[in-house]
Amino acid sequence: MAVENVRLLKGVPLFAHFNEKELGAILKTAKERTFAPGEPIVREGEQTDIGFYLILEGQVEVKRGGRTLSKLGSGQFFGEMSLLDGAPRSADVLPTSSTTCLVLSNWDIKALIKTYPDIAMKIIAELARRLRQTDMALTE
């Protein structure tokens, strides 16, 4: 499962430019957690130190104000922004089936950055890329 998880992480844009050593460190730090259908993973407005979730198995719905915004499945992720800024959650995330996630807290990522400082620049570069895409989409 570890090799499979490295492949999954490598497929996440946030981690796409990480080397094997950095990905291995993330996998050693991250926790695997399983959620029952309907059990809230995160709640809109909630303040938490757990930031990033990578879905290993299962499916979730992302909802705001009771309205479904998106559905995510294996290999997809959520919570990457609060991993860095710790802001309250912008939506509810609820599993529609038994769902297993790889979970990375804000504290975990800060500890990893101390050991692997290049991680910070790689994360910043990806966030800048996403911000640029959003800016371009808004100006079109």
What are these regions (language model features)?
Residues 5, 22-25, 89-90, 107-140:
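A small-molecule sensor/coupling module
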Residues 5-6, 10-65:
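Regulatory nucleotide-sensing modules
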Residues 6, 12-16, 39-40, 67, ...:
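Flexible, active-site-adjacent loop/turn segments at secondary-structure boundaries
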Residues 35, 41, 52-56, 84, ...:
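Alpha-helix boundary/capping detector
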Residues 61-73, 138:
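Generic structural signal for short, solvent-exposed loop/turn connectors between secondary structure elements
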Residues 68-124:
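Cyclic-nucleotide recognition modules
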